[in-house]
Structure formats: structure tokens, C-alpha cells
């Protein structure tokens, strides 16, 4: 009897887990859970073990070629490159077939995204300009965490109109494109010509695979792995390889199959339930030891938090409103400016993307206090934006 009861409980738990992973908000919830666990570990008696685990040396060697990184660097440079493969595929799909496929569809979220990148950077610069050592952090509040923002919106999925969801997705995708450009232009150092040549050859092979509409995903994975390793060695940030790989996968194969859709379907679950939660676990572990009230007035913390809480909504809403009034763009049917403002606030959730940019802007040499304060600023700004964004979205969709 007890044995049957255990089996029944086991089946019930499995069904609950399956039901959870089918939720639209499951990725966002898991992301938040991972961040909370990381913060708890970083401020517990297990903090040393947590940090030692993240700094475990991990090496990959094939003949004379080797990559030696700590575990956290493998997560940030390797796993996040896989995430950017997914981003690249999503951007390509939207550009050719989706919400960004026509000028009329693309211009409104594009202008909004530009405002959402420029104004947060200006807000950051205005607050942090007194300290030249903080100059590199201007890009941190530019980013939007797609998974988290969509996760919050999914909590109100039945109330939110479809055009508003499409606007958020298009806005976040263009935002990611901006982040990719920033990484390429400002966070690539000490370039290796030899590695860049290998990268160029790999890119040419990917272009040929795409040109001949090769559907075998293993071919893109093998060449993509070579491209990633070459880009990593070149001094350009390795996540850019992910975007190139994503763009190289064809929308349609020779026999009408859809390799991009197939690969996107595979990676979407890995990204939501493994890669992003793992990234949050590795990067959200902020230790509060030695932190006092005076740190709240730190220019770095204030600059990042203000960029996310104030800069994002002001930039997105302001540019959107002005573009419509000047006749440069048209407000999508079925949504109003109050809802645009709610989404603009929601886009202040920088979280994993902002932490990623912070890890590039301030390396280990910047000092523990700088890294801690930057992560605190991101957590504060993202948390406030998530709460306010949810409340505004709930109110505006309810009124609608």
C-alpha cells in the first residue's frame, strides 16, 4: 500500500513539474529562482564553496589548441553564445517573416528601442561622470532581459492584447541587436589577426551552407563551434559568433523543411530552462557583507538603477510618442500610449543582459566593490522595474 502511495505521489509530482514547464512564465520564474538561490548562497556559510565552484578551472584541449577558463567564464562566454544563437535566429525570422518584415512594422519599435538605448546611457553618464573609472559602464542600463520581461507579461497573458506582446518582442529583439553592436564595437580588445582569419573562413563556410540551403543542423554546429573558438581567441567577444551562427541557418531547406524553426524549437527550451537560469546563478550571487547604507548613494549604483528605472521608460515612451506625433511612425492597432508606457517600464528589467554587459565593462581588475555595486544597481533597477511594470501593465490592460 505504501509502495503504491509512493508511486502515486511520484506521478503527481512529475505531472506538476510538466505543468509548470508548460507555463508561459516558467522561464521567468526559474530565472528569478536561480538568482535568489545565488544571492542566498553568496550570503550564507556556503559562500566560499559557491565562489570556489564558479572559479573551478575548466580546460578544453584538441592537439596544440587549448582553451583554459574558469567555470563562470565558460558560462558567460560559452553558454551565452548559445543563447545568442537563439537571438540571431529570432531576429532573422522577425526580419524576414515576422514583426519586423516591413518598414511600417519595424519603424515604431525601432525608434522606441533607440530611445531605450540612448537615454539610459545618457542618464548613466550624467550621474557617473564625476568618476572617470566608471566611464565603461554606460552600456549596462541599455539592455532588456527578454526572458524576464516576457515572463512578467505572461503573468497577465489573458489580459494583454497580442499587438502589445508583439511590440515588446520586437522592441527587445532590436534592443538585443543594439547590445550586440555595442559588444562588437566597445568590448573587443587585443585582436589576433590569425584567429580573425580562421573566423572569416568559418563565416564563409556558414554563408555557403546557407546559400545551398543545407538543412543538416550538425553541419552548422560543427562549423559554428570552430567559429566560436576562433572568435574567442581573436579578442572579439565570443557571443558575436552565436549571432552569426543564428543568422546563417536557413529559413527553408531544399525540400521545404524549416531548419531554423526546428533548431529554434530545440534551443528555446535549453535557453529558458538551462542557459539563462545558469547565467543568473553564476552572476547574481552578490554578497551583502560589508555593504552599508552609504553605498546606496554610490554614483555607480545610482547611475545603473536610474538608467533602468528612469532612462528606459523615458527613452522608449518619449521616442515612441514623438515619432507618432511627427508622423514618422504609426501606433500599432489595438494598443494605446498608456500600454506603451507600461511596456517601457517593463523594459527596465535589465537583469541577465545588464549583468552580462557589466561583466564586460568591469572585469576582475576593476575591484570587488565595483562589481558588487554594479550588480546591486542592476538588481535594484530590475526589481523596481519589474514591480512597477507589472502594476502599470495590469492597470492599463484592465482599463482596456
UniProtKB/Swiss-Prot annotation:
GO molecular function, one term: sodium:proton antiporter activity
Reactions catalysed, as given in the entry: Na(+)(in) + 2 H(+)(out) = Na(+)(out) + 2 H(+)(in)
Compartments reported by the entry: Cell inner membrane
Coiled coil residues, start to end: none
One GO term of the biological process aspect: regulation of pH
GO cellular component, one term: plasma membrane
Principal location listed in the UniProt entry: membrane
Disulfides per UniProt: none
Known function: Na(+)/H(+) antiporter that extrudes sodium in exchange for external protons.
Protein name: Na(+)/H(+) antiporter NhaA
Naturally occurring in which organism (per UniProt): Haemophilus influenzae (strain ATCC 51907 / DSM 11121 / KW20 / Rd)
Phylogenetic lineage: Bacteria, Pseudomonadati, Pseudomonadota, Gammaproteobacteria, Pasteurellales
Amino acid at each position: 500500500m505504501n509502495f503504491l502511495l509512493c508511486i502515486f505521489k511520484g506521478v503527481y509530482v512529475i505531472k506538476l513539474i510538466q505543468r509548470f514547464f508548460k507555463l508561459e512564465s516558467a522561464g521567468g520564474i526559474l530565472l528569478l529562482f536561480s538568482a535568489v538561490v545565488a544571492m542566498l548562497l553568496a550570503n550564507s556559510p556556503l559562500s566560499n564553496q559557491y565562489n570556489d565552484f564558479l572559479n573551478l578551472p575548466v580546460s578544453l584541449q584538441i592537439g596544440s589548441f587549448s582553451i583554459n577558463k574558469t567555470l563562470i567564464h565558460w558560462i558567460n562566454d560559452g553558454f551565452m553564445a548559445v543563447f545568442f544563437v537563439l537571438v540571431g535566429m529570432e531576429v532573422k525570422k522577425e526580419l524576414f517573416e515576422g514583426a519586423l518584415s516591413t518598414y511600417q512594422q519595424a519603424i515604431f519599435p525601432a525608434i522606441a528601442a533607440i530611445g531605450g538605448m540612448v537615454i539610459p546611457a545618457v542618464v548613466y553618464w550624467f550621474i557617473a561622470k564625476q568618476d572617470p573609472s566608471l566611464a565603461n559602464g554606460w552600456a549596462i542600463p541599455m539592455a532588456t532581459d527578454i526572458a524576464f520581461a516576457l515572463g512578467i507579461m505572461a503573468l497577465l497573458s489573458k489580459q494583454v492584447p497580442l499587438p502589445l506582446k508583439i511590440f515588446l518582442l520586437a522592441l527587445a529583439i532590436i534592443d538585443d541587436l543594439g547590445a550586440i553592436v555595442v559588444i562588437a564595437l566597445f568590448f573587443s580588445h587585443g585582436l589576433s589577426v590569425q584567429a580573425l582569419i580562421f573566423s572569416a573562413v568559418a563565416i564563409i563556410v556558414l554563408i555557403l551552407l546557407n546559400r545551398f540551403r543545407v538543412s543538416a543542423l550538425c553541419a552548422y554546429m560543427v562549423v559554428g563551434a570552430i567559429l566560436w573558438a576562433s572568435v574567442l581567441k581573436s579578442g572579439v567577444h565570443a557571443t558575436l559568433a552565436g549571432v552569426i551562427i543564428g543568422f546563417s541557418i536557413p529559413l527553408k531547406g531544399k525540400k521545404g523543411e524549416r531548419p531554423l524553426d526546428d533548431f529554434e524549437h530545440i534551443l528555446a527550451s535549453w535557453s529558458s530552462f538551462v542557459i539563462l537560469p545558469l547565467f543568473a546563478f553564476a552572476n547574481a550571487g552578490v554578497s551583502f557583507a560589508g555593504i552599508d547604507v552609504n553605498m546606496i548613494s554610490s554614483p555607480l549604483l545610482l547611475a545603473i538603477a536610474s538608467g533602468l528605472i528612469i532612462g528606459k521608460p523615458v527613452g522608449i515612451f518619449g521616442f515612441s510618442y514623438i515619432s507618432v506625433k511627427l508622423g514618422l511612425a504609426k501606433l500599432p492597432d489595438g494598443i494605446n500610449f498608456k500600454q506603451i508606457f507600461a511596456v517601457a517600464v517593463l523594459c527596465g528589467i535589465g537583469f541577465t543582459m545588464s549583468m552580462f554587459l557589466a561583466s564586460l565593462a568591469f572585469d576582475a581588475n576593476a575591484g570587488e566593490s565595483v562589481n558588487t555595486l554594479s550588480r546591486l544597481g542592476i538588481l535594484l533597477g530590475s526589481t523596481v522595474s519589474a514591480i512597477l511594470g507589472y502594476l502599470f501593465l495590469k492597470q492599463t490592460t484592465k482599463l482596456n
